Amino acid sequence: MTETLQSCSLTTLLDHPGFLEGEFWYRKNYDADQLVFLEGETGSEIYVILNGKVSVCAQVRVSDDRHMQSGLCELFDGEEFAHSCFFDNEPHSATVKTVSPCQLAVIDAEKLKQFLYDQPDIGFLLLFHWMKIILPRLRQSNKRFSSLFSWGLKAHQIDSLIQ
């Protein structure tokens, strides 16, 4: 237990004797190029990649009748995604699709909340771990937004009007 308390991720939590497979989580196998979930769908599960690779993509509206997929990142063994359903019931902000055959641990967010309520020391460490994952992703998103905004200003020659 001391090992878990020094560092806690969902991967280490899967090995916790009280966080039983079949009760709190289950394994799901995916073939390559298979959809895990779509942007806009509401989900109640958090995922850990046990093996394989997934791609995270978002819809970009080019015009009213044209859309394209933009690749945001790829995630690999041990990485986690879809954390937001733990905090709210908002739809997924991206589509996740497998790149290679994958085995995912699928964790019920409500059951995880109950487990962490009963184990607040683990809950604190897991939330801290999530902040270490989510903050770099947010920073990267901010950089991309700034770059695209700057590009848009230059493309429309608005940058020359700004003093």
What are these regions (language model features)?
Residues 1-163:
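Cytosolic regulatory regions built on CNB/CRP/Popeye-like sensor folds
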